[in-house]
Amino acid sequence: MSYQITINNNTTSNVQNIVIADPNLASLGENVVFSDSQGPLSSLYVYDGVWVIKLRSPLSPGQSITITASSGTPNIDPTIALYYNNGSSYSNLTLVGSPTVSIVQDFGGYAISAYASGDFFLVASPTGFTPSSSRLLVVDRWATTPTSLDAVGLRLYADTNDWFGVVRKYVNGAQNVSIEQKISGTYSVVNEIDISQFAAFTDPLVMYLSINGSTANVKVYKQGSNIGTVSGNYSTTPYGNPSMAGYGTVDKHYANFIVLPYEPDPQVTVTPISSPSPTPTPTPTPTPTPTPTPTPTPTPTPTPTPTPTPTPTPTPTPTPTPTPTPTPTPTPTPTPTPTPTPTPTPTPTPTPTPTPTPTPTPTPTPTYDITYVVFDVTPSPTPTPTPTPTPTPTPTPTPTPTPTPTPTPTPTPTPTPTPTPTPTPTPTPTPTPTPTYDITYVIFDVTPSPTPTPTPTPTPTPTPTPTSTTSSNI
């Protein structure tokens, strides 16, 4: 990912060392190269998303320039700062350039441990440090979770040696942090900078102390966003060194300290540079996908074709009389496959589901609606009921269509039959071999002729004849 950075010098001074704090850059980490039209620029890494960039030449008031930031090897130049450390050492900072400046840190036994026990950073200027021409950029980088502490403070101090200190303390890992108004101790705190408005800090927290003349401007950055600015005066009136006693100890952590020549901050805008070109390429790919979709459409069409397959099965109906016994599965198929099947072919689509129900229905009565049937299955006697099958074939074709519609009318006319289909599936496996078995006991629920009348099939069949014949057979 690359970013475009526009720097607009809306100040009244020349600017060359630009401080950029932006969350977009944080995704690139420390491997960021900044370039203008002539190539890479010098830069100094502060923290993820926070950099100091040195322009090739000062930018005059009213001018603007556009540079880019992208992943790559940074062109680190420590001389950008008056002094700088890389955040990995607890020793005094290496001096870069002039004037003579030193930094003192208390991380458990360093130079000013006699003055305090706590978490703080101090910039000391025994000689040659002119606050009006310098600014301090501090980034705190925790290595471990801080111990139980109760407040956070950012303070500016001044004593006989012009000590300037930044003091920070955390609560629950910098969650729900409150700003402390005062620092207790034996020595007075001079012109403390009040940043109580900056509540609820979270790491990483970038503190930018800009010292210009007698005014100290503090900018607090959280995740690269400028939370706000407050100002306060400082004094060089002789005071004793400020006491930090009573603040407890904290876990060790790393910190980057950078002191820069003072310059006002120009307007900086960071925007992502995206390349949507590749996106459209995959778009056409989905277009061909719909083409294969129609192919499966014809596949369902053959589904009805297998339905007629059972049609030839009815012809050998007499022969398969014994066959049903071993194979209950095929039995239901032949029963609903009467010659008239072609006509109700469209209806058969739902037939597969009710197939078990019609099996018993066709055998007993074409005209009557079977509500409940109990069968006594006997193996050998099958041949004996030969006379029964004789009438059966005739009605068989008729019922076949009937079974298909039967499930439909049954629930409609008689509310009682509605539950009947539920039990019917249970006996269905038994009745499957109806032609093979001898029916010992049958209970029929005879419905008036009108029921079959709605079915076109019963009309051609002589209604009276089958009725009496079936009764005599039973």
From Swiss-Prot:
It comes from Thermoproteus tenax virus 1 (strain VT3). Residues 278-467 are annotated as: 3 Thr-Pro repeats regions and two near identical repeats. It comes from the Viruses. Residues 268-474 are annotated as: Disordered. Keywords: Repeat. Sequence repeats lie at residues 368-377, 437-446. Thr-Pro(N) repeats lie at residues 278-367, 378-436, 447-467. This is Viral protein TPX. Residues 275-365, 380-434, 449-465 have a biased composition (Pro residues).
